[in-house]
Amino acid sequence: MKTKTCKNLISNEQIQEVQEVYDTFKCRNGEMDKINIQYGFRALGVRLGEEEVEKIFKNQQYINFNSFLDIVTPLIYKIDVYASFEQAFSLFDRDGSGYITFDDLKTVAINLGEARSDSKLYNMIKRADLNGDKKISKIEFIQLLYWKKIY
């Protein structure tokens, strides 16, 4: 059943929040229609276009809670993962420049008690630096985490 998979992607508190949003925007028949689903998604911080909504409601007028949860869970998970990546990036981007430099990486390594040689730190930058500017942008950092499956 898909709901079990959903429970693995988001927390019980998030599932409870989805339930509260569903209960707030459901129709009198206990299910959600095309109009109210848009409100529900927005309340959860998710934006869907008209075409995506049409796909959800293909050949039906309403969806039940389990369907709503199955649809919204991966979207919430993506938002959470991206937010976690941004938070991790900001820990490395010590000066808020939008980049992780060699000095940023070295400072973090020292603060974590990770003794790394300069050459190892430069190699770490080099592996993540996709455009060759000798620093890691937020996009490069996130791509590295996805590529290495560190999430």
UniProtKB/Swiss-Prot annotation:
Q: Which GO terms describe its cellular component?
A: centriole; centrosome; cytoplasm; nucleus
The residues the record assigns to binding Ca(2+) 2 are: D129, N131, D133, K135, E140
Q: Name one GO molecular function term.
A: calcium ion binding
Subcellular localization:
Cytoplasm, Cytoskeleton, Microtubule organizing center, Centrosome; Nucleus
A GO BP term here is: cell division
InterPro entries under this entry? Centrin_CML-like, EF-hand-dom_pair, EF_Hand_1_Ca_BS, EF_hand_dom
User: Quick one: which residues bind Ca(2+) 1?
Assistant: D93, D95, S97, Y99, D104
Gene3D superfamilies assigned to the protein according to its UniProt record, in alphabetical order: EF-hand
For whether the record's keyword set contains Calcium, the answer is yes
Keywords of the record, alphabetical order, are: Calcium, Cell cycle, Cell division, Cytoplasm, Cytoskeleton, Metal-binding, Mitosis, Nucleus, Repeat
Which SUPFAM superfamilies does the entry link to? EF-hand
Main localization (coarse):
cytoplasm
The EF-hand domain sits at: 80-115, 116-151
Q: Which Pfam families match?
A: EF-hand_7 (PF13499)
The extra comment attached to this record reads: Binds two moles of calcium per mole of protein.
Functionally, this protein is described as follows:
Plays a fundamental role in microtubule-organizing center structure and function.
The UniProt entry's sequence similarity note says:
Belongs to the centrin family.
* Name under which the protein is recorded: Centrin-A
**Lineage of the native species?**
Eukaryota, Amoebozoa, Evosea, Eumycetozoa, Dictyostelia
